[in-house]
UniProtKB/Swiss-Prot annotation:
Record gene name: tetM
Record protein name field: Tetracycline resistance protein TetM
Listed GO biological process terms: response to antibiotic
InterPro entries in UniProt: EFG_III/V, EFG_V-like, P-loop_NTPase, Ribosomal_Su5_D2-typ_SF, Ribsml_uS5_D2-typ_fold_subgr, Small_GTP-bd, T_Tr_GTP-bd_dom, Tet_C
Homology family: Belongs to the TRAFAC class translation factor GTPase superfamily. Classic translation factor GTPase family. TetM/TetO subfamily.
The organism's place on the tree of life at top rank: Bacteria
PROSITE patterns, per database record: G_TR_2
Biased composition, class Gly residues, residue ranges: 627-639
Entry annotated with the keyword Zinc: no
Keyword tags: Antibiotic resistance, GTP-binding, Nucleotide-binding, Protein biosynthesis
GO molecular function: GTP binding; GTPase activity; translation elongation factor activity
Length: 639
């Protein structure tokens, strides 16, 4: 049986969960339609999700059509849960991008489409809610071509749009489809220019090929609630998006080592962690011993090994084969992002979170349970980067205020803990400015000091590398426990740099070492390492960087001058201005700490008509005269 892993992506309230419920019901996977409003949907499994009517964690459900099993992954629509979307993108064979026929193309939709196009992930556009008052079809197609992708063609037509009588009919690939395909398919272009004109079969083959390579996007219409157009959408999924098979997933079931990625973690009924694994090659069966690679927040790669004690393959198979998804349990627990058989080739499409907050228990007796709960939540979302901070608090990284509210509710409902969050602050980072070193010799006569010899060199590492530790001394020159003490302390110490911000993209090398067998302990090395490291770091110097966000603002033509003046005053660097009457699109990059102000002031300048979207991009050195950590703008100092 073939397997098709499909992600459903959209702006909040475009109908993702409703479409999932419709697909499951129409193909016999559930015996009744769930409702987001009623709180009885299949894929929305948390109390917070049910009350808010939004998806927070990617959920998996499956149905079967003929010889194809379709695994549906219902992803979050809110921008504060962008990390969940990124993990889902890694495991997909294709995607359905939903639009509301009433609200049309929204800011979040454009961000998602950019990510899908960068990945060249096969994507079908589905215009939902055609039976709602105010629904548009022809005008919306123009917006899709202008704002999402010019390479799109409708394969359905709608009659009586905007009324309960709305209905959908198929529109076979024709000359208009061929003209749209000609922009991305040279054979179709040659046939249109030189003849003979392509037949319907020729156009259909080209449509399938260009959809499969992610360069073209078929568009369907329908209503998830009413069911109109859903059969046509399924027909498009099966016919236009290549399904995973053992051959296309990177291995067969006959002896190749398994390769896959953990994209979600959920707590089990007995407190165990259940991991969701997409397998790209090989096979996994119960009791098999697996070794996962884990990238720690400080840049190190560690191994997690264990036997599979529980394996539930989506669809009910006994063995997990290439292309499929399963929930499994391994003693010791897995984290989101753990890789089986090495990393995948796909790079992250979204930057890490840039807001930092401190979390404390409202009641002192809950301080220890709060730390344990936050560590458990960090296993589900490693980008939280939970770590100890000053005064018994825990520091977290977040994307926005909604994520903070959800975390507070999760702690209260799932763990019984009342937590208090400080207002989110932009997280600054330090990077080494140069290379330098420091050393401290073992004091043979002074027993009040550390019985250890340590020399360290600090230098810049490649951008995006995090942190690395190496040796120029012989590994046998120190006991293993002393080596481990130095390495762990280096990474712990650099969580706070010279200005109070965390240090990143560094390489620290142990260049000198020594110990006294009867006197030295690992504690001596843990105590001396921070002193030597901070001396070397101060000599090398650091450069403070602040996060930036790439923005896109669509504004009425008569407000362009006022908008650009505002953005310039907030420190924006412009990368482009396109369009004309009636609207202009302004793009650029803006310090993350000024984004909220831009969002609040734009509506007043544009009669409420501005469409704004932004996403984290590469950070930059902090400009002279701007405030950094510890000043009320940057991260928390002294952590």
């Amino acid at each position: 049986m073939r397997t098709l892993n499909i992600g459903i992506l959209a702006h909040v309230d475009a109908g993702k969960t409703s479409l999932t419920e419709r697909l499951l019901f129409d193909h016999g996977a559930v015996d009744r339609l769930g409702s987001v409003d009623a709180g009885d949907t299949r894929t929305v499994d948390g109390g917070i999700e049910r009350r808010r009517g939004i998806t927070i964690r990617s959920a998996v459900a499956a149905f079967t059509v003929g010889d194809t099993r379709v695994n549906l992954i219902d992803t979050p629509g809110h921008s504060d849960f962008v990390a969940e979307v990124e993990r889902a993108l890694e495991v997909l064979d294709g995607a359905v991008l939903l639009l509301s026929a009433v609200e049309g193309v929204q800011a979040r939709t454009r961000v998602l489409m950019r990510a899908l196009r960068r990945l060249r992930l096969p994507t079908i556009v589905f215009v939902n809610k055609i039976d709602r008052a105010g629904a548009r079809t022809d005008g919306l197609l123009g917006d899709v071509r202008r704002l999402l992708t010019p390479h799109v063609a409708p394969l359905t037509e709608v009659a009586d749009a905007g009324t309960p009588r709305a209905r959908v009919t198929r529109r076979p690939p024709d000359g208009r489809t061929a003209e749209a395909l000609a922009e991305v398919d040279t054979e179709v272009l040659a046939a249109l220019v030189d003849g003979p004109e392509p037949t319907g079969e020729d156009v259909a083959r080209a449509l399938a090929a260009r959809t499969a390579d992610g360069s073209f996007h078929p568009l369907y219409h329908g209503s998830a609630l009413g069911g109109q157009g859903v059969a046509e959408l399924v027909e498009g999924l099966l016919g236009l998006i290549p399904a995973a098979t053992p051959g296309t997933s990177g291995g067969t079931s006959g002896g190749t080592e398994p390769r896959g990625t953990v994209f979600a973690v959920r707590p089990g009924p007995a407190g165990e962690r259940t991991a969701y694994l997409r397998l790209y090659g090989g096979e996994v069966h119960p009791r098999r011993r697996l070794t996962f690679l884990r990238r720690e927040s400080d840049g190190r790669t560690t191994e997690v090994s264990g036997r599979v004690t529980r394996l539930d393959v989506v669809g009910g198979d006994a063995t997990l084969t290439a292309g499929n998804i399963a929930a499994l349990t391994v003693p010791g627990g897995l984290r989101v992002g753990d890789r089986l058989g090495g990393p995948t080739d796909r790079a992250p499409q979204f930057a890490p979170p840039t807001l930092q907050t401190l979390v404390r228990a409202r009641h002192p007796e809950q301080a220890a349970p709060l730390r344990s709960a936050l560590l458990a939540l960090a296993d589900q979302d490693p980008l939280l980067h939970a770590r100890p901070a000053a005064s018994g608090a825990t520091a977290l990284l977040l994307y926005g205020e909604v994520q903070m509210e959800v975390l507070a509710a999760t702690l209260a409902e799932d763990f019984g803990i009342e937590a208090e969050f400080t207002p989110g602050r932009v997280r600054f980072l330090e990077r080494p400015a140069g290379t330098d070193e420091a050393a401290e010799e073992m004091p043979w006569l002074d027993r009040t000091r550390y019985f250890a010899t340590i020399g360290l060199r600090v230098e810049p590492g490649p951008r995006g590398s995090g942190g690395a530790f190496g040796y120029e001394t012989e590994l046998g020159a120190l006991p293993r426990a002393f080596h481990q003490a130095v390495e762990e302390t280096v990474h712990d110490t650099l969580r706070t740099g010279l200005t109070g911000a965390a240090v990143t993209d560094y390489r620290v090398t142990l260049i000198r070492s020594g110990f006294s067998s009867p006197l030295s302990t690992a504690a001596d090395f843990r105590g001396l390492t921070p002193l030597v490291l901070r001396r070397a770091l101060a000599r090398a110097g650091t450069v403070l960087h602040e996060p930036y966000q790439a923005f896109e603002a669509e504004v009425p033509a008569d407000t362009l001058a006022a908008v650009t003046a505002l953005l310039a005053s907030l420190g924006a660097d412009f990368t482009g201005t396109t369009g004309g009457d009636p609207a202009w699109i302004v793009t650029g990059e803006l310090p993350a700490r000024r984004v909220r102000e831009a969002e609040l002031r734009l509506p007043g300048l544009t009669h409420g008509e501005a469409v704004w979207s932004s996403r984290p991009c590469e950070d930059r050195p902090l400009k002279a005269g701007n405030s950094g950590p510890g000043t009320g703008v940057g991260g928390h100092s002294g952590e």
